[in-house]
Amino acid sequence: MNFSVVAVALVVVLTVHFTDGQETSSSLPSPPSPLPGRWPWGPKPWHCRPHHHGFTMIYGCEKFSRDMKKEMDALRNNGSESCRTLSTWVEQENCKFEQLMDARSRVVPEEKCLQNMVAFATGITPSTTVTTPTPTTETPTTETPSTP
């Protein structure tokens, strides 16, 4: 009888001690430090990887690349006040990422740069003309019955 009382008391004490220890050690985790060459939210998309050289590799896109890089760096480093008021590091990073994507979609490359980007992606040079056949529909002919 005494053994079972002691065993139950010991289980209760250990459970309470373990539960209290879990609650007091739940401080906010520090933000993860990204590995060099990796974003905190996973690997970079294929078009952002260094071996693709971005837009600088495409003829006529140097100015576009510089302007975009300047704007992206400013957003990446600073974000905006609306992002800084968010409570967690993850929310702040997601907010900055969304602003970065919005800014990227607002940057419109010059026409020549856009043509060269298409040429670079497809392998078709701007001087090559690709003609698509226009669909032709045959008009159905109906025979009129001849009357005798």
Swiss-Prot record:
What are the protein's UniProt keywords? Disulfide bond, Ion channel impairing toxin, Secreted, Signal, Toxin
Question: Where does it reside?
Answer: Secreted
- The residue stretches assigned to a coiled coil in this entry are none
Q: What the entry says about post-translational processing?
A: Contains 2 disulfide bonds.
- Specify the signal sequence span: 1-21
Q: Which residues form the propeptide?
A: 22-38
**Molecular function via GO:** ion channel regulator activity; toxin activity
GO cellular component labels = extracellular region
Q: In which tissues is it expressed?
A: Expressed by the venom gland.
Q: List the disulfide bonds.
A: none
Q: Where is this region: Disordered?
A: 125-148
Name the job this protein performs. Probable ion channel inhibitor.
The protein's name in its UniProt record = U5-hexatoxin-Hi1a
**What is the scientific name of the source organism?**
Hadronyche infensa
